[in-house]
Amino acid sequence: VLGVLSIIISGIMLKKFKIFTGDPAPFVMELPAYHVPTAGNVFRSMWERGSSFIKKAGTIILLSTIFMWFTLGYGWEGGAFCAVSDIDNSIMARIGSVIAPIFTLPGFGTWKSAVAAISGLVAKENVVATFGQLYHFVGEVAEDGSEIWSELAADFTQVGAYAFMAFNLLCAPCFAAMGAIKREMNNGKWTALAIGYMCAYAYVVSTIIYQIGGLITGELTFGIGTVVAIVFIALIIFLLVRKPAKADSTDGLRRMSVDAN
């Protein structure tokens, strides 16, 4: 629901900017007649999708997991670079500590949660593997996952967890999808704009969820974060109700020129 609603809201807001204005164009898609799929087609599709995920898991996810393992296992202790006994002294802890303040407003401003969120840009599946390494989820756990929840509760409130999931749902997809966006748009600037918008929109929505949700549930008190969330809400409402920008006769030519380049 959040994803579909975000698509509708984004479409309305972006249409108000001059760069996206233009005459509505009809979209016609010719659909073939529906048939019951054959067993061969089903298994072929299953094989293609399964092999694609295996290749992805064996390359991007594996390499990123190895990188996470190394940066979490090594760092500086006692003035020397070595295998660390405390994860807070690792290379990744230092990197995450620099990134973490950015995610304070959305409610996951610890270095562990910030690293997990960034790892989702490599592959969304990577967030789970990153959590496993950061919080030492090894061996078997109870059916209700009580061991996992007790570990995560130290870094996430209930509303903060929802904000974290919303951010990962709405932010830029994995590297493979970013590559597909680049191929379809055939323009580096438009690709950067699309990815930047998705990340910014995800940040705004997750901030609103955490700050307003925390205020309603009593997890937070009214403060600067609440004011920022209200400003974000007001900005979204303004972009939704404002009048669309008027397109001039050269807009289409400029867009065609940009796309061609």
Model-identified regions with their sequence ranges:
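Juxtamembrane and boundary regions of transmembrane helices in multi-pass small-molecule transporters
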Residues: 1-31, 135, 151-255
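Hydrophobic alpha-helical segments of membrane proteins
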Residues: 54-70, 129-130, 134, 203-211
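Residue-level signal for the membrane-embedded core of alpha-helical transmembrane segments
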Residues: 5, 58-62, 122, 126
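Juxtamembrane inter-helical linkers in multi-pass membrane proteins
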Residues: 20-45, 92, 135-147, 256-257
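Generic, ordered loop/turn and secondary-structure boundary motif
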Residues: 28-37, 54, 109, 122
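Long hydrophobic segments that form regular secondary structure
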Residues: 15-23, 34-81, 97-100
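Membrane-proximal intrinsically disordered regions of secretory-pathway and membrane-system proteins
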Residues: 58-68, 218, 225-234, 260
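Extended, low-charge hydrophobic alpha-helical regions
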Residues: 65-199
